[in-house]
Amino acid sequence: NTISLREDPEAVNRKIRTMPTDPARVRRTDPGEPGRCPVWQLHEIYSGEDVKAWVQQGCTTAGIGCIECKQPVIDAVLKELAPIQERAQAYTQDPDTVKNIIADGCEKARDLARETMRDVRESMGLYYG
């Protein structure tokens, strides 16, 4: 499963909320083991020490449910995606800018390829210019 950089908040929320959790934690009242839960890997990346301690304590004592555990991850992922999506919005609204950027890149690539081929031909003794 993936979360794309331009994923809307509802989809991010849905995808994280439906992530599998500790397979041994069948019921809300069962204590869990964060190390066996894929959501914990996201906490390791996105959560501060205070949230990780809350998850460790809450999960191992069945003090929190899996949905509660996932909410800080959802919030952190959305916060991280927000500036990326804002920058992307500018390009979405102005396709001509995107076309110009691509055209400039193509021109630079052509110039570089032309120089490289000239060097190759010269090295092979095939350059007559």
Where are these regions (language model features)?
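Conserved nucleotide- and phosphate/pyrophosphate-binding catalytic cores
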Residues: 1-129
